[in-house]
């Protein structure tokens, strides 16, 4: 499945939750979801009954859209999560959170995961001092993620850091804002990852 390129705020209204797809509008409270917290279209305010399969599929789609992951990548991550010891659903969220594009977003260097992905693919991100342009790379504990020197003064990066000051940084990451780098100190616990996703439904879907 190709990445969604349609109206992202319409998508958020369909799922009924913020997917963090519109950074500045989301933080300012001006997103379409803030104004109209119901589905798009003529019958958007009606709540149609959904089957168990429909709920499971919707949850997977929501997670893929939120993190900007293709079906092939998502399934690959699930297979790895299922291989690891522990709860498969929790493993799934932890693995997704370790993706380089997501870590760049979590460090506050971009207002959306999509913008963070562009920083990575365009070669603006260093991992342990070396350029890495693979958004799906799994960051390990202790690794240093840095914005390339020439990009540190980029207005979009600077603005993203200003906006992040309103929301704070997640506890498994340390960031030196002035120097535009951060350390992925440890893997997150599931309860620390605040995302509107019921991973149990995704596990049920893939387990059929």
From Swiss-Prot:
Question: Which keywords fit this entry according to its UniProt record?
Answer: Ribonucleoprotein, Ribosomal protein, RNA-binding, rRNA-binding
Give any Pfam family that matches.
Ribosomal_S4
* Domain S4 RNA-binding residue range list: 98-161
Q: Which GO terms describe its cellular component?
A: small ribosomal subunit
Return one GO MF term: rRNA binding
Q: InterPro entries attached here?
A: Ribosomal_uS4, Ribosomal_uS4_bac-type, Ribosomal_uS4_CS, Ribosomal_uS4_N, S4_RNA-bd, S4_RNA-bd_sf
Domain of life of the organism in this record?
Answer: Bacteria
What SMART domains does the database record attribute to this sequence? Ribosomal_S4 (SM01390), S4 (SM00363)
Biological process annotations from GO: ribosomal small subunit biogenesis; translation
The UniProt entry, under SUPFAM superfamilies, shows: Alpha-L RNA-binding motif
* RNA-binding listed as a keyword: yes
> According to its UniProt entry, what is the function of this protein?
One of the primary rRNA binding proteins, it binds directly to 16S rRNA where it nucleates assembly of the body of the 30S subunit. With S5 and S12 plays an important role in translational accuracy.
Q: Which family does it belong to?
A: Belongs to the universal ribosomal protein uS4 family.
User: What do we know about how this protein assembles, alone or with others?
Assistant: Part of the 30S ribosomal subunit. Contacts protein S5. The interaction surface between S4 and S5 is involved in control of translational fidelity.
The protein in question is named Small ribosomal subunit protein uS4
Gene name as annotated:
rpsD
């Amino acid at each position: 499945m190709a990445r969604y390129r349609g109206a992202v705020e319409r998508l958020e209204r369909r799922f009924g939750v913020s997917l963090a797809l519109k950074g500045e509008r989301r933080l300012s409270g001006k997103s379409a979801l803030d104004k109209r917290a119901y589905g798009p279209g003529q019958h958007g305010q009606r709540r149609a009954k959904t089957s168990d399969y429909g709920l499971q599929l919707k949850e997977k789609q929501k997670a893929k859209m939120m993190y900007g992951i293709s079906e092939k990548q998502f399934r690959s991550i699930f297979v790895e999560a299922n291989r690891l010891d522990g709860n498969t659903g929790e493993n799934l969220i932890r693995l997704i959170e370790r993706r380089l594009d997501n870590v760049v977003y979590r460090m506050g260097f971009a207002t959306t995961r999509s913008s963070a992905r562009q920083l990575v693919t365009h070669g603006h991100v260093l991992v342990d001092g070396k350029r890495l342009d693979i958004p799906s790379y799994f960051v390990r504990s202790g690794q240093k993620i840095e914005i390339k020197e020439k990009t540190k003064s980029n207005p979009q990066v600077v603005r993203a850091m200003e906006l992040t000051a309103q929301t704070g940084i997640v506890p498994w990451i340390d960031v030196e804002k002035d120097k535009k780098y951060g350390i992925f100190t440890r893997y997150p616990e599931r309860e620390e990852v605040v995302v509107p996703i019921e991973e149990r439904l995704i596990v049920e879907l893939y387990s059929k």
